[in-house]
């Protein structure tokens, strides 16, 4: 398992739908990259210059929206994860 450091989180991206609303099946090149995912691991938080640690605002299991091209993809076996900085998270979906 991956353990994020600092203010990073690890997410599992939600897959984009295979068909458009009109029913047409989309090819891989026609699909937009999904910018939603579920957090599976959270780092300790951000360390300020004065040594204070700020706790993350998100938790494991949160469904989030993140910036479109943010993060680094990492493959572990057959699964692909995305490592993001907490600042790249735009919202929590409730």
Swiss-Prot record:
Keyword list, A-Z: Chaperone, Cytoplasm, Stress response
UniProt GO molecular function: ATP binding; metal ion binding; protein folding chaperone; protein-folding chaperone binding; unfolded protein binding
InterPro entries hit by this protein: Chaperonin_GroES, Chaperonin_GroES_sf, Chaprnonin_Cpn10_CS, GroES-like_sf
GO term, biological process aspect, one: chaperone cofactor-dependent protein refolding
SMART domains the UniProt entry points to: Cpn10 (SM00883)
Example of a GO cellular component annotation carried by this entry: cytoplasm
Keyword Cytoplasm in record: yes
PROSITE patterns per UniProt: CHAPERONINS_CPN10
SUPFAM superfamilies: GroES-like
Function: Together with the chaperonin GroEL, plays an essential role in assisting protein folding. The GroEL-GroES system forms a nano-cage that allows encapsulation of the non-native substrate proteins and provides a physical environment optimized to promote and accelerate protein folding. GroES binds to the apical surface of the GroEL ring, thereby capping the opening of the GroEL channel.
PANTHER family per the UniProt record, alphabetical: 10 KDA HEAT SHOCK PROTEIN, CO-CHAPERONIN GROES
Family assignment from sequence similarity: Belongs to the GroES chaperonin family.
Name of the protein described by the UniProt record: Co-chaperonin GroES
